[in-house]
């Protein structure tokens, strides 16, 4: 507080001059620019659990006097679930660490010359790591943090890079009947005031119920509508069901929440009353970025906070809904010879189907072009 002369308070101009004399030297201080930049190059866009994660850390330095105090790469994988129960206002949240490891990229005291430098990184991902996943009620995130502590603040820096991890699963892990053809049949009775109004018969045929990510599911749907009303908005859907589990903060009580996500849908149109229709070659593709089925065959009692399942659902109005559970793996067969034979069998089946269709098209064209049949 400046001294008061003659009992008078200092003017506003005096305060402004004092403030300017204090702040101007701070503004004139030149901000130093960083002298290092960090980036990474991945060997693959995603890594499989149980395998080695390989990457290269790229360091670009413009300061010849940079001395490394510590230079490390840290990989973390954390799963989190959480929500608020709207009825009880209880908060449920759970956190689980799947991987937390750190490696040194170079020794302390190393002098980095000007230029670009590469540091290889190889870390084994645990076999039980679940797939990367993002949703409203939970997530499984993996990240790689590269931190450089150097002799100067301008040379010290850190960067965080997200990683994509995929659960390791094969066709060898699924039950044998999942690789066999299946015919799913169901009937829906419509009654009103105990009076029968007819029945709708549903039939879905699949070559198998186990697929790997990136494959297409081919289904044949047959609907026999024996009612007096037509069916509307008939559709075949590929649904991913996710079950989350979290624990309350104070009572330590577990609660589960189920969410559904539409992956792909094939609209089939409508089915008239007292009519039988067959829909062939309904193709639904499993995206390459979709996580495989998770926690479907663990028999050791280990529970996952995020479990992922897939179903093939047939829906129609009014009130028709039926599901076939599916298994989605990240890989085919573990044995490469067995996988090659399986792929050869699929190619032969597709070739036979395409040849039959071609013959049918030729026969139809000959009949249509013959003037005798016009």
Swiss-Prot record:
SUPFAM superfamilies: E set domains. Residues 344-374 are annotated as: Disordered. InterPro entries: Arrestin-like_C, Arrestin-like_N, Arrestin_C-like, Arrestin_domain-protein, Ig_E-set. One of its GO terms (cellular component) is striated muscle dense body. It comes from the Eukaryota. GO terms for biological process: protein transport. Coiled coil: none annotated. Pfam families: Arrestin_C (PF02752), Arrestin_N (PF00339). Belongs to the arrestin family. This is Arrestin domain-containing protein 15. The lineage of its organism: Eukaryota, Metazoa, Ecdysozoa, Nematoda, Chromadorea.
